[in-house]
């Protein structure tokens, strides 16, 4: 069918663009993610961000261990890519993106991650939280959909850090609970969110 043909081309697009994509793993990386995930569970008005990062550096056991570079093309499974393709196609029928060409869809909605964060299955997590906001027949354009999502994101705690304890792209499951972070962290959160809702965006 035509749909199967497009999905095959989508898979080819991802594979052709994977050659130089990678991510870091290791005990130091996992330790940092666990620390940030735990801190993001704390709700308060203000955060002493330099103190929080200094605490991590003091407590970290594996900070000096070199992480391992993993290449997407060698580590991501076919099932992972297929699930991402299926979930991306599921939102390519919204009023605000039906006009997109296949090439535009591949460029703006299909990608499975933003930067060098650890790849994970993230779209369902974001869809559950944000898609209900767009279930309104009056939302017809990408600009309208984008405003709805932005209005919701602005309600999140926004505390901008000038540096982080480790220069990592945070994974989507961490970002969705953000309490503070780099400007890029908030931008990546918005991109993940809008991409999952079928709003064509990029950085």
Please provide the spans of the model-predicted regions.
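Hydrophobic/aromatic-rich core segments of domains that either
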Residues: 140, 145-152, 163-173, 179-203
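N-terminal accessory/pre-domain segments preceding catalytic cores
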Residues: 1-147, 151, 155, 175, ...
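A short secondary-structure junction motif
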Residues: 156-160
């Amino acid at each position: 069918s035509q749909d199967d043909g497009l999905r095959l081309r989508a898979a080819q697009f991802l594979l052709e663009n994977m050659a130089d994509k990678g991510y870091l793993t290791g005990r130091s990386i996992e330790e940092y993610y666990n620390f940030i995930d735990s801190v993001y569970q704390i709700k308060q008005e203000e955060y002493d961000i330099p103190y929080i990062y200094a605490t991590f550096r003091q407590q970290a056991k594996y900070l000096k261990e070199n992480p391992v570079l993993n290449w997407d093309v060698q580590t991501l499974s076919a099932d992972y890519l297929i699930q991402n393709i299926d979930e991306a196609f599921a939102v390519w029928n919204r009023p605000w993106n039906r006009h997109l060409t296949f090439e535009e869809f591949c460029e703006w909605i299909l990608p499975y991650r933003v930067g060098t964060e650890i790849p994970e299955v993230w779209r369902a997590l974001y869809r559950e939280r944000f898609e209900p906001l767009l279930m309104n027949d009056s939302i017809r354009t990408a600009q309208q959909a984008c405003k709805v999502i932005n209005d919701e994101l602005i309600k999140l705690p926004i505390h901008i850090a000038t540096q982080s304890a480790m220069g990592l792209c945070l994974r989507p499951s961490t970002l969705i609970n953000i309490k503070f972070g780099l400007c890029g962290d908030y931008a990546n959160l918005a991109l993940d969110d809008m991409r999952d809702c079928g709003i064509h965006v990029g950085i």
